[in-house]
């Protein structure tokens, strides 16, 4: 099996198989019936088709730890997955049962949707067919024009199956989930056209989430690579994935990704719209953008980054910046505003856009197109002017029943980070904050996963709900498979550190389980409990490869004579004992003190 996510809302150390969970068919054992390693299990909900996946880590002391899992069916040995078929539509019956949506023909797929001219042959797909060959489907939308969003249901007092699902994942009551969504403090991205997802929630009362970016460009990558990167990212713990493709076959790539993704998929519709006008920002129109949004909503995109806060009056505020406008979406909209000397069409048509998103339950991710791209530009007038507009737009979106989160910076030194979260929470009425890092210094190309991981841990501790990962390739190139893993693991560390600092239920039990395994030299348990078991085992075996080293009471760093934990254990054995023995020893020393005349200091004998 491939290692899956290891964050936990309900990290439990129990004997045997936990109550309420069922193992998959591939549960490993030691030959004597005792489970070892880890396996995919499920927690049963209130209905037969509501089974929440968990990762069960079986310890060598007979206990187990239950961890949050994002890997989907790919790590369930009992499920036969095939990317050409796609995943099973987990939520389909829930959506149909609500009775407020309908199937319809949808818009036809056009050559320009894939960045192709009418006369161009379809090609460049390398190893995958041009059209997704899985089960045929028609798009679904609201039946009567009313919002079919989780926000609308929550406001009506309904606890949907999706809400129950995430409540089990987060180890909280379902009513807590409903209340947070209804108040706009959390979002549950779940397009009615993406029934394959395992529902998750983004909000500061819940586990800090991590997003991984994938996507092709005009110079590199293929559909097959992007599908592989998506499944790879989720197996290492990505809670959502954004497809930021800007090259050929954008529509087709997205279809393959959506049909195979167990997590919500986000996009930036502006990128595809720009491809439809051959990269000329000034030729963009509201009609082209609107059509692109509907195209993506029909496919099943769960959340969309919309740069509606980049307004004409704010563009001059960036003139004195060291690095100007670094957001792709922000620069596109700034160029359009200047070319036409008009207010942004995204801002002008925002209410109409709300109506479209509410029809499919697409969540807004209001983009920070004027985010700082260098430490020198952090927290400037342009950044905060846009933030105030995002606060206004958040209010409008909620009025239309659209779930909304707010995107944040960027490059921010540590002493300026807290101001960002404080202002966002105040201006945006505690809507979930979704930040890229922030990067805390500009001097480390090739190590920006570290510079940003520092800022990510800090801002998540103070309330950011989701972190957008940064890979070692940031500012340098398109990330490959290894870069994706490094980015996800780095940000999972930041997210879990924040969960610990916030006191999230169950967070520390995972750390305690690993600490116990470390102190007791249970090496296999340490590996299996680690965020990255494969690398932990690999590093250990580089210097102590022999199998007996897996049970040795030392590692290669200190060796057998200088291992601090072994010395601590020896002290316990030699000088420890029961409470009664300790108290008897203290009493004996008290008698010796009295017999010596109750003197604190005794003369040194010659």
From Swiss-Prot:
Superkingdom of origin organism: Bacteria
InterPro entries given in the database record: ThiC, ThiC-associated_dom, ThiC/Bza_core_dom, ThiC/BzaA/B
Annotated substrate binding sites: 213, 242, 271, 307, 327-329, 368-371, 407, 434
Entry binding sites for Zn(2+): 411, 475
Gene Ontology MF: a single term: carbon-carbon lyase activity
Region (Disordered): 1-49, 105-147
Biased composition (Low complexity): 14-31
Cofactor note: Binds 1 [4Fe-4S] cluster per subunit. The cluster is coordinated with 3 cysteines and an exchangeable S-adenosyl-L-methionine.
Family designation: Belongs to the ThiC family.
HAMAP family, sorted: ThiC
PANTHER family for this protein: PHOSPHOMETHYLPYRIMIDINE SYNTHASE, CHLOROPLASTIC, THIAMINE BIOSYNTHESIS PROTEIN THIC
NCBIfam families to which the protein is assigned, alphabetical: PRK09284.1, PRK13352.1, thiC
Function: Catalyzes the synthesis of the hydroxymethylpyrimidine phosphate (HMP-P) moiety of thiamine from aminoimidazole ribotide (AIR) in a radical S-adenosyl-L-methionine (SAM)-dependent reaction.
Descriptive protein name: Phosphomethylpyrimidine synthase
Gene: thiC
């Amino acid at each position: 099996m491939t290692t899956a996510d290891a964050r936990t809302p309900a990290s439990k150390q129990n004997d045997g198989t936990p109550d309420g969970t069922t193992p998959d068919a591939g549960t490993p054992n030691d030959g004597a019936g005792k489970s070892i390693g880890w396996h995919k299990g499920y927690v049963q909900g209130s209905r037969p088709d509501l089974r929440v996946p968990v990762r069960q880590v079986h310890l060598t002391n007979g206990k187990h730890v239950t961890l949050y899992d994002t890997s989907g069916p790919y790590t369930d040995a009992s499920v036969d997955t095939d990317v050409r078929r796609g995943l099973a539509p987990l939520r389909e019956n829930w959506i149909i049962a609500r009775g407020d949506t309908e199937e319809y023909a949808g818009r036809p797929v056009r050559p320009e949707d894939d960045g192709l001219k009418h006369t161009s042959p379809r090609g460049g797909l390398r190893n995958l067919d041009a059209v997704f060959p899985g089960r045929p489907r028609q798009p679904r939308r609201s039946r009567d024009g009313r919002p079919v969003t989780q926000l609308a249901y929550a406001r009506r007092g309904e606890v949907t199956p999706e809400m129950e699902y995430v409540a089990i994942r987060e180890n909280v009551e379902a009513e807590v989930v409903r209340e947070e969504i209804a108040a706009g403090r959390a979002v549950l991205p779940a397009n009615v056209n993406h029934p394959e997802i395992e529902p998750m929630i983004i909000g500061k009362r819940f586990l800090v989430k991590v997003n991984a970016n994938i996507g092709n460009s005009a110079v590199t990558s293929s559909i097959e690579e992007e599908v592989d990167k998506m499944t790879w990212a989720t197996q290492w713990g990505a809670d959502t994935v954004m497809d930021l493709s800007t090259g050929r076959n954008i529509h087709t790539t997205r279809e393959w990704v959506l049909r195979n993704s167990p997590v919500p998929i986000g996009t930036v519709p502006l990128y595809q719209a720009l491809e439809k006008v051959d990269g000329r920002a000034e030729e963009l129109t509201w009609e082209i953008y609107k059509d692109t949004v509907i195209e993506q909503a029909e496919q099943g995109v769960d959340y969309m980054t919309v740069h509606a806060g980049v307004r004409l009056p704010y563009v001059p505020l960036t003139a004195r910046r060291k690095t100007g406008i670094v957001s792709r979406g922000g620069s596109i909209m700034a160029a359009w505003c200047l070319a036409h000397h008009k207010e942004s069409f995204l801002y002008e048509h925002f209410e109409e856009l709300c109506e479209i998103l509410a029809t499919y339950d697409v969540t807004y991710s209001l983009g920070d197109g004027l985010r700082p791209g260098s430490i020198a530009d952090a927290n400037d007038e342009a950044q905060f002017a846009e933030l105030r507009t995002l606060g206004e737009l958040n209010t409008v979106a909620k009025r239309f029943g659209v779930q909304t989160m707010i995107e944040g910076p960027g490059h921010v030194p540590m002493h300026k980070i807290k101001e960002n979260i404080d202002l966002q929470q105040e201006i945006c009425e505690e809507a979930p904050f979704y930040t890229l890092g922030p990067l805390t210094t500009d001097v480390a190309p090739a190590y920006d996963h570290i510079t940003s991981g520092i800022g990510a841990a800090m801002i998540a501790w103070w309330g950011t709900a989701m972190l957008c990962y940064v890979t070692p390739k940031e500012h340098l190139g398109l990330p490959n498979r290894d870069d994706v893993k490094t980015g996800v693991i780095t940000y999972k560390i930041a997210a879990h550190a924040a969960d610990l600092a916030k006191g999230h239920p169950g967070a520390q039990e995972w750390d305690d389980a690993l600490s116990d395994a470390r102190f007791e030299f249970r090496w296999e348990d340490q590996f299996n409990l680690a965020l990255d078991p494969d690398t932990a085992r690999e590093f250990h075996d580089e210097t102590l490869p022999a199998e007996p080293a897996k049970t040795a009471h030392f590692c290669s760093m200190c060796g057998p004579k200088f291992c601090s934990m072994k010395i601590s254990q020896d002290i316990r054995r030699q000088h420890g004992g029961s409470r009664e023995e300790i108290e008897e020893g203290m009493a004996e020393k008290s008698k010796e003190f009295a017999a010596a005349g109750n003197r604190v200091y005794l003369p040194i004998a010659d």
